[in-house]
């Protein structure tokens, strides 16, 4: 199975600051990658794909980029509601596999 490795595993930022999460694949030819945000007590929510396409209702401060092995999710200006655990998921090859998650804390 393809291993997805996220960095960092946690980060703490103040509102208005940018944030960036990286995801690296153990296989080099990925075409499709999704990002998800899971908030406490909620199901994961789809965020931008690697080609910056956004799921409906995703704010434009979120952007995704990357190809091959290295992918990045960027948040232009973090807001309090962005706190939670972010996961990357490769959907190029079965079985689809997730990164271990990155916990984003938004300082008060």
Swiss-Prot record:
The name of this protein is Ig kappa chain V region GOM
Positions of the UniProt region annotated as Disordered? 44-66
Where is the stretch described as Framework-4? 98-107
Q: Where is this region: Framework-2?
A: 35-49
Start and end residues of each stretch annotated as Complementarity-determining-1: 24-34
- Keywords on record: Adaptive immunity, Disulfide bond, Immunity, Immunoglobulin
Q: Which SMART domains match?
A: IG, IGv
Region Complementarity-determining-2, as annotated, extends over: 50-56
Question: Where are the stretches annotated Framework-3?
Answer: 57-88
Q: From its record, what is one biological process in GO terms?
A: adaptive immune response
This protein's GO cellular component annotations are: immunoglobulin complex
UniProt keyword annotation of Coiled coil present: no
Comment field (misc) = Peptides were aligned by homology with human kappa chains.
Which portions of the sequence form the region Complementarity-determining-3? 89-97
Positions of the region Framework-1? 1-23
> Which cysteines bridge via disulfide bonds?
23-88
This chain's source organism reads Canis lupus familiaris
């Amino acid at each position: 199975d393809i291993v997805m490795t996220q960095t960092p595993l946690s980060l703490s930022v103040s509102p208005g600051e940018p944030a960036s999460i990286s995801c690296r694949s153990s296989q080099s030819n990925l075409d499709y990658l999704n990002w998800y945000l899971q908030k406490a007590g909620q199901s994961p929510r789809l965020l931008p794909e690697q080609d910056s396409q956004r799921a409906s209702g995703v704010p434009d401060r979120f952007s995704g980029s990357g190809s091959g092995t290295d992918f990045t999710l960027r948040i232009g200006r973090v807001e309090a509601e962005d706190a939670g655990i972010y996961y990357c998921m490769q959907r190029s090859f079965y079985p689809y596999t997730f990164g271990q998650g990155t916990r984003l804390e938004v300082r008060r």
